[in-house]
């Protein structure tokens, strides 16, 4: 090759390199320009007196005549009004901080009622997330109208809103004919199997069959048999108690009357030609029979943790339940019939089996079987669902308005397309920096919890060792579930919700049957079909969870947003009071009354000494007493035992976060004045994050069904046990925020 040719090639390559370098530099400039643009959206990098803020100041200062002297008078009056308030911080910290906000919300809700009875940050943001998800679905469908997935998404999204009444009545008639056929052919197990083949209905079946992880070997999925959930949340309403006063008797009579009216209304809607065959009183009477069977006492050896293992032979010979024939209803035969079944209550199982054999085919029971299906079927037609709402929503739960028609679609969508919604939400909302910040925070809180257990003085060495092992092995999972599989796409029909949901339910059942007795991993999102709400580990849920059977904390992506975490304009006190408190709460669930029954690997295992458990139970009794006493001051009576696990997690969780703040100030060498101000800010933010307006009519049901106590007591009770809080606000005996001890459990 000649010299001139080599020179030309070298020059060409050099030019090419320069061009490449220039392109890289230009791309970097563009990238940096984009970053700067994005950074300018960060409030900390914006001018305070930018145009939007100047407009805000003009509006805010209108009443002050733009005059600093007037503003000083305004502040002085505000402080004077606070001094005159009866709600002093040492008497009622929650009301002291939140009363003005609650009063404003009360007025707002009169004009603009919500479909959720607890108005707080969680519900407000969750509603926003639901609407975002629906928007992602609309965008996908618009761009992929002709694809199979696009058509399926559109069908599921619209099916409840566009439910065809003729098709719905056809399904109701089919149920009517199927149940009559089972009765005519004396096939009790066939009917029980029919009910258990559809999870939308099965939770009401007299005997409920599910395939779920074995509590003592959580990697393996096994058959479980349990009692049904009855139609009324408070079982005491079914019972005529001679001790009831006149007001209680009238309440029960009215509840029964409303319930029977609701049942009759359901039958009249779904069986327009046959509804006169059925009486609502029959459902009431049948549920009382079931309640009696559930409470019988024939078997003495009953496991306190609802874990009773029976073999196929024991089920059939000792309890008289034809397990082999029942399994054949699901095409499970021969050697595939499970030989290990976990029964939650041996007494309930035995007495319910006896009750079924005697009465399952009676007219009363036929009404109950029918109603089990119809009660759920009306919920999948938006127009019909108003019947359900008027009783369970408005009368029972105190809801002022029904779910918006558009929002209602989120439930069938999450049931059918959880993975799609998960991926779309992550695609639009991924927050790597916040994820890292929160991951570090929860790991730091875990470290503090471990140190607290190491310092613990009342746990014996063996119990302490197991507790530390559990905390050390506790896994933190962020953003998305560990296992996720693609959604199955069935042939859905746009105006037939019952067909769609039943088809999907059957598909899900078959997936569970395939893994019965195995250690195969499965990703099947969970829905509570009684409450009609998502209860699994969906990434688009605004919450955080501790799961005892995996000894893990899951923090969904939807929770990693304002107001729960604010890295733009808020400091450590705010973020600890919001996100930190939640994380400390979930960590503490690992050792609460329920979590403490599971070991480091997530298996049910008693690792406590009898002496330690006795001390722990005494602490639990003290917590129950405190929450009931604090509520009693406001004239509220409730049984705090039903939610004591949440109370324990609140008390322990808040103490963990307070200790985190202590270490934070120590590391940063804060002065005493700064420490004091920091703690005050933290306590105030902890009260603000718990603020909630709950509709007055919703309170009775909340006290009976919600494992969490009312937010006022979730705020005041844990704070009252903090020594630093009591010192800063000079809480003394006789003050409302005083409790006889400062025990934070661990």
Question: Which role fits each region the language model picked out?
Answer:
Residues 1-62, 66:
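Compositionally biased low-complexity segments enriched in polar/charged residues
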Residues 83-103, 249-267, 654-656:
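Hydrophobic/aromatic-rich, well-ordered segments within soluble, folded domains that form packed cores
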Residues 126-445, 481, 499-503:
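Noncatalytic, helix-rich "gating/capping" subdomain that lines the substrate-entry/channel surface
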């Amino acid at each position: 090759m000649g010299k001139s040719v080599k020179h030309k090639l070298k020059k060409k390559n050099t030019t090419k390199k320069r061009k490449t370098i220039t392109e890289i530099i230009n791309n970097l400039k563009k990238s940096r320009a984009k970053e700067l643009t994005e950074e300018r959206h960060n409030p900390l990098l914006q001018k305070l007196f930018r145009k939007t803020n100047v407009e805000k100041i003009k509006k805010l200062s209108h009443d002050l005549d733009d005059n600093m002297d007037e503003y000083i008078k305004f502040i002085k009056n505000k402080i004077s009004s606070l001094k005159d308030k009866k709600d002093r911080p040492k008497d009622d910290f929650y009301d002291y901080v939140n009363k003005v906000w609650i009063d404003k919300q009360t007025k707002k809700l009169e004009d603009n009622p919500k479909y959720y009875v607890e108005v707080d940050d969680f519900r407000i943001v969750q509603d926003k997330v639901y609407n975002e998800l629906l928007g992602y679905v609309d965008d996908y469908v618009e761009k992929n109208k002709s694809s199979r997935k696009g058509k399926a998404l559109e069908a599921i999204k619209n099916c409840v809103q566009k439910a065809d009444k003729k098709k719905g009545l056809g399904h109701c008639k089919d149920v009517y004919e199927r149940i009559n056929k089972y009765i005519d052919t004396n096939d009790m197990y066939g009917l029980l199997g029919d009910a258990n083949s559809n999870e939308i209905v099965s939770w009401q079946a007299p005997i409920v069959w599910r395939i779920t992880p074995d509590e003592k070997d959580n990697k393996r999925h096994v058959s479980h048999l349990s009692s049904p959930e009855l139609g009324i949340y408070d079982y005491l309403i079914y019972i005529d108690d001679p001790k009831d006063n006149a007001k209680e008797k009238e309440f029960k009579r009215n509840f029964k009357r409303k319930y029977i009216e609701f049942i009759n209304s359901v039958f009249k809607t779904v069986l327009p030609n046959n509804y006169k065959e059925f009486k609502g009183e029959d459902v009431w009477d049948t549920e009382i029979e079931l309640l009696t069977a559930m409470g019988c006492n024939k078997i003495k050896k009953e496991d306190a943790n609802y874990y009773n293992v029976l073999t196929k032979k024991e089920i059939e010979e000792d309890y008289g339940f034809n397990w082999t024939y029942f399994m054949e209803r699901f095409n499970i035969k021969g050697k595939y019939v499970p030989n290990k079944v976990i029964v939650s209550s041996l007494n309930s199982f035995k007495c319910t089996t006896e009750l079924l054999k005697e009465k399952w085919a009676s007219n009363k029971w036929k009404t109950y079987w029918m109603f089990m299906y119809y009660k759920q079927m009306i919920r999948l037609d938006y127009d019909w669902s108003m019947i359900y709402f008027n009783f369970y929503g408005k009368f029972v739960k105190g809801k002022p308005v029904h779910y918006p028609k558009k929002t209602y679609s989120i439930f069938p969508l999450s049931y059918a397309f959880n993975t799609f919604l998960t991926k779309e939400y992550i695609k639009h909302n991924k927050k790597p920096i916040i994820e890292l910040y929160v991951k570090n925070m929860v790991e730091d809180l875990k470290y503090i919890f471990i140190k607290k257990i190491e310092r613990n003085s009342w746990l014996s060495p063996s119990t302490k060792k197991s507790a530390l092992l559990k905390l050390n092995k506790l896994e933190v999972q962020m953003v998305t579930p560990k296992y996720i599989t693609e959604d199955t796409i069935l042939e859905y029909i746009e105006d037939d919700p019952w067909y769609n949901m039943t088809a999907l339910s059957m598909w899900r059942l078959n997936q569970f049957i395939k893994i019965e007795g195995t250690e195969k991993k499965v990703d099947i999102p969970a829905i509570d079909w009684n409450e009609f709400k998502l209860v699994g580990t969906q990434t688009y849920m605004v919450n955080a969870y501790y799961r005892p059977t995996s000894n893990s904390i899951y923090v969904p992506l939807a929770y990693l947003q304002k107001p729960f975490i604010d890295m733009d304009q808020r400091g450590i006190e705010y973020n600890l009071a919001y996100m930190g408190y939640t994380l400390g709460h979930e960590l503490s669930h690992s050792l609460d009354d329920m979590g403490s029954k599971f070991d480091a690997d997530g298996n049910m295992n008693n690792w406590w000494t009898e002496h330690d458990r006795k001390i722990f139970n005494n602490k639990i009794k003290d917590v129950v007493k405190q929450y009931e006493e604090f509520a009693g001051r406001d004239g509220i009576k409730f049984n705090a035992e039903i939610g004591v696990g949440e109370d324990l997690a609140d008390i322990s969780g808040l103490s963990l976060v307070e200790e985190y703040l202590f270490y934070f100030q120590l590391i940063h060498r804060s002065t005493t004045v700064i420490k004091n101000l920091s703690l005050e800010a933290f306590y105030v933010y902890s009260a603000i994050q718990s603020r909630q307006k709950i509709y007055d009519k919703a309170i009775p049901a909340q006290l009976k069904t919600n494992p969490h106590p009312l937010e006022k007591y979730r705020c005041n009770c844990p704070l009252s046990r903090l020594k630093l809080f009591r010192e800063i606000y000079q809480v003394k005996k006789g003050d409302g925020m005083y409790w006889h001890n400062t025990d934070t459990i661990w």
